[in-house]
């Protein structure tokens, strides 16, 4: 393992290890959205959505573009898609669809 990789991995996975951020990623996987659309979709305060978008955009997992007066957020599919595929493949192979899978919410 390269020196410093542990720190990089920790920072990367810490950015993802948040239910609100994962929900944002899940919604953006359907297509680009504004903060207002994310607020409506997730039922959370605008400040909470903005707070959680910040680390995702800083790490370039989510990208932002200006459309008129609004910022629209979209996934960096080049990075996110392989991660989501790896998680799905791992769960299919090792969780056998069971409710006792430690990867499922509440099982840890």
Regions found by a protein language model. Name each.
Residues 4-47, 67-80:
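N-terminal helix-turn-helix DNA-binding core of bacterial DNA-binding proteins
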Residues 1-4, 8, 80-108:
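Amphipathic alpha-helical dimerization/coiled-coil segments
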Residues 44, 49, 103-105:
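A short, surface-exposed loop/turn module that caps and links secondary-structure elements
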Residues 40, 57-58:
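Alpha-helical residues within the helix-turn-helix
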Residues 52:
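Residues within the DNA-recognition helix of helix-turn-helix
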């Amino acid at each position: 393992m390269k020196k410093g990789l542990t720190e990089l991995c920790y920072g990367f996975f810490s950015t993802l290890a948040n239910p609100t951020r994962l929900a944002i990623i899940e919604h953006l996987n359907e297509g680009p959205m504004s903060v207002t659309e994310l607020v409506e979709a997730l039922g959370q305060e605008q400040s909470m959505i903005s707070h959680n978008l910040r680390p995702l955009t800083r790490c370039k997992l989510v990208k932002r573009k200006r459309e008129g007066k609004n910022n629209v957020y979209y996934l960096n599919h080049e990075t996110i898609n392989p991660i989501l595929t790896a998680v799905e493949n791992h769960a299919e192979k090792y969780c056998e669809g069971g409710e006792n899978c430690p990867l499922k919410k509440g099982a840890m």
